[in-house]
């Protein structure tokens, strides 16, 4: 069993805490004037993306999580499973709908994404930070609407996602969206 000593906790380390995989977002070593030193850590649960804050003694240690990230190409879905392929080894991987979650609205066929495996089972799918998706439905704009008004309207994308876009965006436009926030970036 490989372990991380709490003094070696660094941002990006993946650990097992309470029998689940976590990602260390940040860690701070604290040496009070009186008493034992400790490490204050922000952890992100990889299964649910929940963020928690914990304090560990400087003598504590945690097991290293057997978490592997693969860059895979999204192929298709059948409503229950999403299928991905490794372009180097041509191995196919299926991921359940509940694991895909809300990320399904950012997955386009033939796009690459990161699939995180824990004990050789998929636990998380992370799409590219920016994706270009076609607008299939939006309100018509009136002549005279300009870019500088700061006013937005709703647009439905080909993946089913709903995004606020500027007034000049029309049906059929290809727009760039930030998948982390779900916001329009550019066209």
Swiss-Prot record:
It holds the Pfam family EFP_N. One of its GO terms (molecular function) is translation elongation factor activity. May be beta-lysylated on the epsilon-amino group of Lys-34 by the combined action of EpmA and EpmB, and then hydroxylated on the C5 position of the same residue by EpmC (if this protein is present). Lysylation is critical for the stimulatory effect of EF-P on peptide-bond formation. The lysylation moiety may extend toward the peptidyltransferase center and stabilize the terminal 3-CCA end of the tRNA. Hydroxylation of the C5 position on Lys-34 may allow additional potential stabilizing hydrogen-bond interactions with the P-tRNA. Pathway: Protein biosynthesis; polypeptide chain elongation. Keywords: Cytoplasm, Elongation factor, Hydroxylation, Protein biosynthesis. Its main location: cytoplasm. It is found in: Cytoplasm. GO terms for cellular component: cytoplasm. InterPro entries: Elong-fact-P_C, NA-bd_OB-fold, Rib_uL2_dom2, Transl_elong_fac_P/YeiP, Transl_elong_KOW-like, Transl_elong_P/YeiP_cen, Transl_elong_P/YeiP_CS, Transl_elongation_fac_P. The modification N6-(3,6-diaminohexanoyl)-5-hydroxylysine is found at residue 34. The keyword Protein biosynthesis applies. GO terms for biological process: peptide biosynthetic process. SUPFAM superfamilies: Nucleic acid-binding proteins, Translation proteins SH3-like domain. Belongs to the elongation factor P family. Involved in peptide bond synthesis. Alleviates ribosome stalling that occurs when 3 or more consecutive Pro residues or the sequence PPG is present in a protein, possibly by augmenting the peptidyl transferase activity of the ribosome. Modification of Lys-34 is required for alleviation. This is Elongation factor P. It comes from Buchnera aphidicola subsp. Myzus persicae.
